Amino acid sequence: MLDFIKGKVITVKPDKIVIQTGGIGYSVKIPIRVSRYINRDEETQIFTSLIVKEESIEIYGFLESSERDLFEELIKIAGIGPKMAINILSTYDRETLYKIIDHEDIKSLSKIPGIGKKTAQRILLELRGILPSLQYEKDQKYDDILSALLNLGYKRLEAKEVLDKIYNNEKDEATIIRESLSILAGKDGK
Amino acid sequence: MLDFIKGKVITVKPDKIVIQTGGIGYSVKIPIRVSRYINRDEETQIFTSLIVKEESIEIYGFLESSERDLFEELIKIAGIGPKMAINILSTYDRETLYKIIDHEDIKSLSKIPGIGKKTAQRILLELRGILPSLQYEKDQKYDDILSALLNLGYKRLEAKEVLDKIYNNEKDEATIIRESLSILAGKDGK
Amino acid sequence: MLDFIKGKVITVKPDKIVIQTGGIGYSVKIPIRVSRYINRDEETQIFTSLIVKEESIEIYGFLESSERDLFEELIKIAGIGPKMAINILSTYDRETLYKIIDHEDIKSLSKIPGIGKKTAQRILLELRGILPSLQYEKDQKYDDILSALLNLGYKRLEAKEVLDKIYNNEKDEATIIRESLSILAGKDGK
Amino acid sequence: MLDFIKGKVITVKPDKIVIQTGGIGYSVKIPIRVSRYINRDEETQIFTSLIVKEESIEIYGFLESSERDLFEELIKIAGIGPKMAINILSTYDRETLYKIIDHEDIKSLSKIPGIGKKTAQRILLELRGILPSLQYEKDQKYDDILSALLNLGYKRLEAKEVLDKIYNNEKDEATIIRESLSILAGKDGK
């Protein structure tokens, strides 16, 4: 629901900022390593994730939408809540985390406060499944269409097989989507 | 609660846009077939439906309020959640869907990802009951008054019977409502 | 949380309006008898009540804050939800409802759609307890202080007894509150 | 989520104000002793706490962020909800409350409406544990870093031990955080 807040930074704490737009000051939780890049009284854009629980509504914020997207993937993993996800991103940035996953570097993962060896192994397993979708398959357009087909309920393998056959960066998005849908609809014997 | 958002489109993905008003960027899920009509950096009005769950608040958006109304009718059908409803509207627009219902075209309905033959039949049944209310009975004013009487708790048959007797497009809305209510209150032996 | 919305009326239906402020159009449910006093394209102030349920957030709106306050009292009565409360206020305005209560006019109460004789009797009983607090005891200041003392947890009888002793419209609110609290704290043997 | 509202005060009641920003009037519950410092039609900044329940969203407001922070600590104590916390802060301001805790003054605590002797003793016990964190350990920067380390999951003793070793007000926040995290990560044998 809430993609970003653009406003004036009012306060900066190691793990929280207050950013104002209109007459409202929003308090936003941030990864500790990010606070040094945010300055009081400056106009800033924070990419946000609205976390709704039965008795709380909180906003988590990031300087890049790709880091916010990674945060939203992390909290889909069973056992990783917003607090643990922000700990992970407080300790390592996105690129470092990819390397840790690629090198199966359990030791670095378990340096994150609150993460023991067993949790580190489970996170490694789950992140391996997610990270490809967070690194561009081919390019942004290909990825956007693939994720739309997955959201429609098609399996990754099925969607990629069709997309790889017809994908060509010259074609516009709408054409590629229409072609994929008609092949996929046909493939399902519908 | 949220009828529309008027703002500048920041990003357009096949199934999602980000639209900004004030300092806030709202992320809005849209039917895939609609994204080709939305352009980045353009001032746009999106008719919205706020979907509140225990652990999420999401916004679904449409270029026409009638399509948003159809979406809100679809999600009242048991077994059809927002995701399935957006799949239906990603595959077919409103007019096509009416034809499919009128011609009891199960084959086309089951082309929608995630919808098998059995679900298609059930949707057909339920949609037949809803669609009349989404196509104008006589005209907008007649429909608005009828839906207000239904919301007050009167049965469709009872309300239509009274409305058909006294309805005349020349009369203003308040008069028609007052007359219907007094007849309906009288008819209930109250 | 949401006391009022000031904005331009975009659409008026018998039981619903859309009012815009900033780039957001809010959809607000209203009593049917009120829609005739609201005109499209006019700047209007609507006094609101935000109704939060597990799977919905809705706004109910009124042209006067006293009618909104009555609505919020009605929905505190067991068995009366927002829909029934808006039916009551769609059928009768505040003054008429007071007369109905004063004259114990069950017949008029049960003319409200969805309200049978038994419910009418129960509403009558409960409304008798509430209405005094909605009609000014003495004046607005007296009522505001009385309701603040009740919110603090003091019984109506206890609070009125103290307030009646020290109340004088010439004194300012803060002084009256301080004097009442010190007497009440003393009376509790604290 | 909601740190403050800056706007024009529309109404002031003993325990509630309405403050407007943009076209929205927000109703905010305040401690009774604070209302005398708030004037109608004046531009005011209210530090807020958004209280989300299954069937309500309410805003509690304070003239100082430190009083709001104390309110948010109080409601973490089992058995103290927002209503009781606002009663406590309606009866005593922050400084007086500190003295009451320091002097273990049960009598004053139980003067708060709704608080008997037993609850007073329990509150005393719990507040003793919280108050140090609300009074500056050394200075604002030291406190912000300490609370960030606690939020990351480190124990207070462990975090304070490391922070006391390396803390020096000349160093900037980012450096102190980086140094503490590397020592803490090392200390955990990670």
From Swiss-Prot, chains A, B, C, D:
Residues 64-139 are annotated as: Domain II. The keyword Oxidoreductase does not apply. Residues 1-63 are annotated as: Domain I. Keywords: Cytoplasm, DNA damage, DNA recombination, DNA repair, DNA-binding. InterPro entries: DNA_helicase_Holl-junc_RuvA_I, Hlx-hairpin-Hlx_DNA-bd_motif, NA-bd_OB-fold, RuvA, RuvA_2-like, RuvA_C, RuvA_C_sf. It comes from the Bacteria. SMART domains: HhH1. It holds the Pfam family RuvA_C. It is found in: Cytoplasm. The keyword Transmembrane helix does not apply. GO terms for cellular component: cytoplasm; Holliday junction helicase complex; Holliday junction resolvase complex. Its main location: cytoplasm. The RuvA-RuvB-RuvC complex processes Holliday junction (HJ) DNA during genetic recombination and DNA repair, while the RuvA-RuvB complex plays an important role in the rescue of blocked DNA replication forks via replication fork reversal (RFR). RuvA specifically binds to HJ cruciform DNA, conferring on it an open structure. The RuvB hexamer acts as an ATP-dependent pump, pulling dsDNA into and through the RuvAB complex. HJ branch migration allows RuvC to scan DNA until it finds its consensus sequence, where it cleaves and resolves the cruciform DNA. Belongs to the RuvA family. Has three domains with a flexible linker between the domains II and III and assumes an 'L' shape. Domain III is highly mobile and contacts RuvB. Homotetramer. Forms an RuvA(8)-RuvB(12)-Holliday junction (HJ) complex. HJ DNA is sandwiched between 2 RuvA tetramers; dsDNA enters through RuvA and exits via RuvB. An RuvB hexamer assembles on each DNA strand where it exits the tetramer. Each RuvB hexamer is contacted by two RuvA subunits (via domain III) on 2 adjacent RuvB subunits; this complex drives branch migration. In the full resolvosome a probable DNA-RuvA(4)-RuvB(12)-RuvC(2) complex forms which resolves the HJ. This is Holliday junction branch migration complex subunit RuvA. It comes from Thermodesulfovibrio yellowstonii (strain ATCC 51303 / DSM 11347 / YP87). The gene is ruvA.
